[in-house]
């Protein structure tokens, strides 16, 4: 509900109605709405983390892993119309800051592992620094949601994430990696997800 409606808009009454229980019962498990928001954010992050771990168990090549991880994140955080991240930052700044740090730690670990694996298998250049590249990637992805730079009506987040991931891979890939990327793009690209609405007449 928080992702679909927004952290500010959802009330404890909404939660109790959605779950089919009394508000008193909700308060038996959560002290207040802030407590519920914090637990919900942790659950979302844990779910994404477990999904990514599952992808890593599929024995894909490192570039395929990145594209599958992107699909998971977009699926889990599919509703950007309510700007849940902005609402969280504005109305629950302490929770937002904690989540931001935990999200960075999760992403950083996954990316560094992916980069090292890519170097070892010949998909990424041997001269890159995995720690630095991981942080550059993290900052870049985070910046995609800056409204003053990207009009979400013209450039929706899924489109921006696709563009940025391709940009990231091209910057670090070997010829072998570029060939793999090209194969993935041929199979994966479709106008609705890879092009902004303005480019397809919406």
Task: Please place each PLM-identified region on the residue numbering.
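Short secondary-structure transition hinges
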Residues: 78-113, 119-132
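Hydrophobic alpha-helical connector segments
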Residues: 39, 50-83, 134-137
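Secondary-structure edge/capping motif, primarily at the C-terminal ends of alpha-helices
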Residues: 55, 84-88, 144, 148-151
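C-terminal peripheral helix-coil segments that are non-catalytic and often amphipathic
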Residues: 113-117, 121, 154-202
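All-alpha amphipathic helical-bundle segments outside canonical DNA-binding/catalytic cores
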Residues: 64, 102, 120-136, 154-163
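Amphipathic, non-transmembrane alpha-helical scaffold segments
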Residues: 37, 41, 45, 96-104, ...
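Helix-turn-helix
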Residues: 1-35, 39
